Amino acid sequence: MENTVTPNVGETAYNRFRQFSTLSYNCIKLLMDENELIWKLLKYSDSDAWSKPNLTQAEKGALIYSGQQDTSQYHVFMDGMQPDVQVKEITLLRIMPTFAVGMNRTLGYIEVGMEVFSHYKINHLSNYKTRIDTITEELLATFNGKDVGGLGLLSFDKMADQSSRLFEAGQIPFGGKKIIFSTYSA
């Protein structure tokens, strides 16, 4: 007698959230190509960092943590963790998926958190703006309504997700802000 396997009807219709693990990388890649000011504010701690020359792709890449032993040498991360103590007066950027919700079996959304932290001693810039607010503004302008490498349109509005918001973050001596974007997943 032959065993017959009856397929589960609709099994392939379920959302697999396959873009979840590549959202951080795709956001950083887009940022490398589309925003020069953020990279200058991350690399240079001077008050005139905004007026420095643009960084090369290699210089930007050197700021991104990719599993090295000492995390304190890097400025851009794809998670919210930092096991090494930060003793330098620097600016950090963290981009990571923070939450996912299945709205039904085929549609869901993913929240993407973007955190910027800057040491208080280097936060004020010579153009009468702050580093944290400038980077936050640039993140909103760069990512709101942007397709992130074919993975979904990031949005910062209450129509896509009630959790989209911007709020203060950090702990002395590092102040910061966190933005929550969302994207649909199908």
PLM regions with names:
Residues A100-G102, H119-N123, A186:
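Generic "edge-of-domain/loop-turn" microfeature
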Residues I132-A186:
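Acidic-leaning, charged glycine-interspersed low-complexity segments
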Residues P83-L92, Y120-N144, G152-L154:
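Acidic, Ser/Thr- and Gly-enriched intrinsically disordered low-complexity segments
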Residues M103-T106, Y128:
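Short histidine-centered beta-strand/loop micro-motifs
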Residues K88-L92, L107-E111, A169-K178:
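A general secondary-structure signal for short beta-strands and their flanking turns/coil
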Residues L107-H124:
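Short acidic, glycine/tyrosine-flanked loop/strand segments centered on an H-E-D-like triad
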Residues M1-N104:
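Small/polar-rich, solvent-exposed N-terminal microdomains that initiate assembly or binding
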Residues M96-T98, G113-F117, I180-Y184:
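Residue-level recognition of well-ordered beta-strand positions that form the cores
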